[in-house]
A protein has these predicted regions:
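Conserved AMP-binding/adenylate-forming
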Residues: 32, 48-93, 393
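Gly/Ser/Thr-rich phosphate-binding loop
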Residues: 147, 204, 231, 247-306, ...
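Conserved AMP-binding/adenylate-forming core of the ANL superfamily
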Residues: 21-56, 94, 98
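AMP-binding/adenylate-forming catalytic core of the ANL superfamily
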Residues: 72, 232, 340, 360-361, ...
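Conserved AMP-binding A3 loop
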Residues: 35-37, 140-166
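Conserved AMP-binding/adenylation subdomain of ANL enzymes
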Residues: 166-183, 191-230, 245
Length: 490
């Protein structure tokens, strides 16, 4: 029987009142623990207060500043329990972008309530605008998407949310070493899709959830050891930083049943490093999108047999189409379209153009890739990321991976830099290890031993950090096309 979130949380609290539901950390990093009884009571109180603050005759949504804190976790759960659409907001969102998001939400729902640190809902004063859209299907939650290319869109997930033992978590997550009641660590921010949905799945499946308020690689390793974490979701950026730790001991990960990585393309060195650390049977990769058009899954042993793949469709059909909308043969790159039965898990944008869809129900978020003869998907860079050097196409990921292989380099981003003759050349923003020093000519020579000549960066800029989203996705749009600081390589 499908249960409401409120009923499910209450049932767990009745059955296991003293078991730990959540572990968080205060601003002083002191441990904060809530039992299931304490968590259920606080969720019920906050849900009641939220519903009391709303005009139930009007459509409304709740916005929760979603740092990885106990109040944020309670606020999200309370909105779901109250069956009020909830939007987890990055607390560091600039005011102009935040106001734009509020206007989008107001356009869909009419009223927006922001929950403060005490979980008190405050109505957002929206400037006069168009009347709210006509009533639509019920919404469980809303998530920001597309931040790697500018101001995010908002994707709405149909609701209300229900707990169904057969469908919680989803079938694909159940294939990744997941067990009900396990100990789970949330590393990524709750306002991002993968950590948010992992939190909801863990909540409904009675897990003990540890919330890491910010990523620090040594701390992540310590939390895994201290709490005997069994299931962990990471991004490739997290994985690279952890692998760089000195004296990394595989014994510290003995409790882990599985690591699932998502959110961005993972370079081969990082993937092999984690397979070496845990063994191939404990490393999983999931490719999907906030919009829920479909997913692929690959385990480490499959990846070793087909390096670079993100797996085969899981309850998902995949079709690769060219620019004219025609299917292409295996091995040929094109736009990735996916289809799931009855639009399972599909979300749609709030006040945005609908997701691009074919007449027979295949949908795309614009990613590019190719299929091999076995149906395994390999992602390619999107057209706007590819660097065109005199007609030769350069995959920025390949350049970045070559630079990260240098012992002085922590991170790098490759971008197109205008060139009078070639149209563009490769430029890079490079982050060095603390205390490291390296000449641009040395980095260029290092790349020259790994890359074709036209792929070698011609301009270098040394920076303290490169712009990434909370999920670790590179935000190339934040990088200026022209490099400064005398950054041209000799």
């Amino acid at each position: 029987m499908a249960l409401s979130v409120r009923r499910r949380v209450a049932d767990i609290a009745r059955a296991e009142p003293g078991r730990t539901a959540l572990v968080g950390f205060g601003t002083d990093l002191a441990e904060q623990v809530l039992s299931w009884r304490e968590f259920a009571d606080r969720v019920a109180d906050a849900a009641d207060e939220l519903r009391a603050a709303l005009d139930l005759s009007m459509r409304s949504c709740a916005v929760v500043p979603a740092g990885n804190t106990l109040p944020a976790a309670i606020g999200i759960a309370a909105a779901l329990a109250a069956e009020v659409p909830v939007f987890p907001l990055n607390p560091a969102t600039p005011p102009a972008e935040r106001d734009a998001l509020f206007r989008l939400l107001g356009r869909r729902f009419g009223h927006v309530h922001l929950m403060d640190a005490q979980l008190t809902p405050q109505r957002v004063d929206l400037t006069a605008g168009p009347e709210p859209l006509a009533a639509a299907d019920s919404v469980a939650y809303l998530l920001a998407t597309g931040a790697s290319s500018g101001i995010p869109k908002i994707s709405a997930r149909p609701g209300p949310l229900r707990y169904d033992p057969a469908g919680t978590p989803s079938l694909v997550i159940k294939q990744t070493g997941w067990r009900a009641g396990q100990r789970q660590l949330i590393v990524g921010p709750l306002y991002h899709t993968a950590p948010f949905t992992a939190f909801i799945d863990g909540l409904l499946d009675r897990n003990t959830i540890v919330l890491q308020p910010f990523f620090a690689p040594q701390w992540t390793v310590e939390l895994v050891r201290r709490y005997a974490i069994e299931w962990l979701q990471l991004t490739p950026t997290h994985m690279r930083e952890i692998l760089r730790l000195p004296d990394l001991d595989p014994a510290g990960f003995a409790s882990l049943r599985a690591v699932l990585h998502t959110a961005a393309r993972c370079d081969a060195d990082t993937k092999r490093g984690w397979i070496g650390l845990l063994g191939p049977e404990r490393v999983y990769e999931l490719y999907g999108a906030t919009e829920g058009v479909g997913v692929t899954l690959v385990r480490g042993d499959e990846w070793l047999a087909r390096p670079g793949t993100v797996g085969r469709g899981f309850v998902t059909q995949i079709r690769i189409l060219d620019d004219a909308g025609h299917p292409v043969p295996p091995g040929t790159a094109g736009t990735v379209f996916m289809r799931t039965p009855q639009r399972v898990g599909r979300s749609d944008y709030v006040n945005e153009q609908a997701i691009r869809t074919t007449l027979d129900g295949f949908a795309t978020v614009g990613d590019h890739g190719r299929l091999d003869s076995g149906g395994y998907l390999y992602l390619e860079p999107r057209d706007h990321d590819i660097i065109n050097v005199g007609g030769e196409k350069v995959d920025p990921d390949e350049v970045e991976a070559a630079l990260r292989d240098h012992p002085a380099v922590i991170d790098a981003v490759a971008v197109a830099v205008p060139h009078r003759t070639l149209g563009s050349v490769v430029g890079v923003h490079v982050v060095l290890r603390p205390g490291a020093s390296v000449r641009r000519a040395e980095l260029a020579a290092h790349c020259g031993r790994r890359l074709a000549g036209y792929k070698i960066p011609k301009q270098f800029t040394f920076v303290d950090q490169v712009p990434r989203s909370a999920a670790g996705k590179i935000q190339r749009w934040r990088l200026a096309p022209q490099h400064e600081n005398g950054a041209t390589a000799p």
